[in-house]
Amino acid sequence: MNKTTIFYKTQNILIEKLEKQSNIEVLKERNFFAKIFSAKKIPDIYFHSGSLDDDSKENILNSKITIVNSFAAMNEIIARTKISHEKIRVIYPSIEVEYKDPKEIKVKICEELQIDNESKIIFFTAKNIKSSGVKEFLDICSSLNYQNFKVIIAGNNKQIYNLRFQIPKYPNLENRLILLEDYKNIDELFLAADIFILPTYNKSFSSNILKAMFCECVVFVTIENDVREVVDVFASMDSSTDPSIAFKIDAILLSEQDFNQIKKQNRELALEFTLENNLVKINHIIENV
């Protein structure tokens, strides 16, 4: 059986699944001696991520298909390499969350954290909470007029330790803020949350927004991030300090019907990007290489 060869710079859950298929061969990064004594193998499919360096350009120009995770990345590659649209495909990051009834999970989390179950939960987490806008997140939450809400920030021990020094600047959040260090089941926090805000300065596609949508959260994210391609105008922040976001959040929290409708719409949209659906998309591409 002829195998389809793939190469990637960074592994993700979709690639992990592909590697287990019998029709796939993964080309490994060449060591120093291989670079000197053997010709470089060009993959059939190249999964591009990160900077567009010379090696990346070579793979893009010579592979049959390049996969990227946003149209912004696709457009940049086309502009800088002049390859045709036919040689590049967009597959958004995959969602792999064990979906459970958000209402049941919220009851569980509220009991665990001693929160009133009627409170709205506004959630924030990121790999790098500083560059993802944790200060701006706190600024937004402290500007809300709506009263019955709790704020949860989850991060690793070092992130939360450093963040604690900033908390005294937000006295009106003193009784509303919960900081969680190295929380084991982050997915359950997404399921329990009502709103997920990411005032990030990072451009790279935030898969946490897709995860939050899948878990029926109302989301807000800056237009600097490539995930803007899948959210609507209401969810878009002009900048990390967009002054209109607090007003939007107040408005949506006061309209239960609109609030629930957005949560439902977000989940329906995010279902397209489950790992199972993305696996179907990439295998369709493989079949037609």
Please place each PLM-identified region on the residue numbering.
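Nucleotide-activated donor-binding/catalytic signature segment of Leloir-type glycosyltransferases, i.e.
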Residues: 164-182
